[in-house]
Design a protein with these regions (language model features):
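Amphipathic alpha-helical segments enriched in hydrophobic/aromatic and basic residues
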Residues: 2-9, 51, 69, 124
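Amphipathic alpha-helical packing segments from all-alpha helical-bundle domains
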Residues: 8-18, 64-89, 99-103
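Hydrophobic/aromatic-rich alpha-helical bundle segments in the mid-to-C-terminal region
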Residues: 51-55, 66, 88-133
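Short helix-capping/turn signature of helix-turn-helix
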Residues: 55-61
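C-terminal alpha-helix
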Residues: 83, 134-141
Length: 141
């Protein structure tokens, strides 16, 4: 059951990401990064329970199921790392280690579900905008 919930979340996340054109090279890295940040925030704010299970219960999976979920997470993280590497290559981002930057950004973005409450002081769009500004400043050259 736990594996099925996690697999469903990751499959849904990856399926929703692809049509957004985030990983494609047609846009500048800064535009792709903004799309990624906003997508991640909105997707996760709509599913806080699934996010909690998917990120906090990984340790409770057996080795085979852990490897499957870890592979799906890696595929998702690779989209962000590709953007960060492209931005570093064109001089718009300063990320000395793209993998560490990827993990740091993902952790920051995913953490929003621990405190955000619908109907609170900020809308989901407000939060996405604030997080985008923080991420942009963190990686800008």
């Amino acid at each position: 059951l736990l594996f099925d919930l996690m697999r469903g979340h990751m499959d849904e996340l990856l399926a929703a990401l692809i049509p957004k054109g985030i990983a494609g090279a047609e846009a500048a890295p800064i535009e792709r990064l903004e799309r990624f940040v906003r997508f991640h925030i909105h997707f996760h704010l709509e599913r806080p329970d699934a996010v909690f299970v998917s990120y906090m219960e990984l340790r409770n999976l057996g080795p085979e199921n852990f490897a499957v979920i870890e592979g799906l997470r890696r595929r998702y993280e690779d989209h962000l790392e590709t953007i960060l590497k492209a931005g570093a290559a064109d001089g718009s981002f300063a990320v000395p280690d793209s993998k560490i930057a990827t993990l740091a950004v993902i952790a920051m973005l995913t953490g929003v579900t621990t405190w955000y409450r619908s109907g609170g002081r900020l809308s989901g769009e407000d939060v996405a905008g604030l997080y985008w500004e923080m991420v942009r400043r963190a990686v800008s050259a």
